[in-house]
Amino acid sequence: MKKAILGKKLGMTQIFNENGKVIPVTVIEAGPCTVIQKKTVEKDGYEAIQVAFGDIREKLRNKPVKGHFAKAGVSVKRHIKEFKLEDSNSLEIGQEIKADVFEAGERVDISGVSKGKGFQGTIRRWNAHRGPMTHGSKFHRAVGSMGASSDPSRTFKNKRMPGHMGNVNTTVLNLEVVRIIPEKNLILIKGGVPGPNKGLVQIRNTVKA
């Protein structure tokens, strides 16, 4: 991984490119993220950096976390995340990673926690077909067959059934960075990204490049 940053999803809008074409974009407040720890092979067995993002009142953090930030000489933040970067040696504790680490036209992968949908049936959760609605049909949106009878005498694991939908870690690959607004720490991404407005997202260079 070459570049990575934490951000907050602000919402969606649309912009016009130089040809007058409308592009739907997601606006993300990316950073500034502060480096609070460097992991090394000698001490930790691997190389990585730990970054913090988002303001929070100090009294809402416990003493161990406050001490972790105090050791780095950084004010207490809301989110902490670790990234394995190729050039982690070039970053120092206390250094800020800002939105301009990316450029317009780059491809990125964005991870976040998807919106929770609560308990849903198989039609919405798994795009299952419904049953007949007329001619004496006894099932319409029900699950239908869940498996065979005497053999195997059970329902197989991972059978697609009703249950909780959403609220899971989700990654969307190969999204385009349309525009960077560095003075406001904003990144405009083409299309949608996981999660609700004000939700935490991770932006990193794509693995499909």
UniProtKB/Swiss-Prot annotation:
Superkingdom of source: Bacteria
Pfam family, one: Ribosomal_L3
Entry GO terms, CC: cytosolic large ribosomal subunit
Keywords: Ribonucleoprotein, Ribosomal protein, RNA-binding, rRNA-binding
Keyword flag RNA-binding: yes
A GO BP entry: translation
Region (Disordered), start-end ranges: 128-163
Alphabetized GO MF terms: rRNA binding; structural constituent of ribosome
Record's keyword annotation contains Metal-binding: no
Family in the record: Belongs to the universal ribosomal protein uL3 family.
HAMAP family: Ribosomal_uL3_B
Subunit annotation: Part of the 50S ribosomal subunit. Forms a cluster with proteins L14 and L19.
Function field: One of the primary rRNA binding proteins, it binds directly near the 3'-end of the 23S rRNA, where it nucleates assembly of the 50S subunit.
PANTHER family in the record: 50S RIBOSOMAL PROTEIN L3, LARGE RIBOSOMAL SUBUNIT PROTEIN UL3C
Protein name, as recorded: Large ribosomal subunit protein uL3
Organism: Clostridium botulinum (strain 657 / Type Ba4)
Lineage per the UniProt record: Bacteria, Bacillati, Bacillota, Clostridia, Eubacteriales
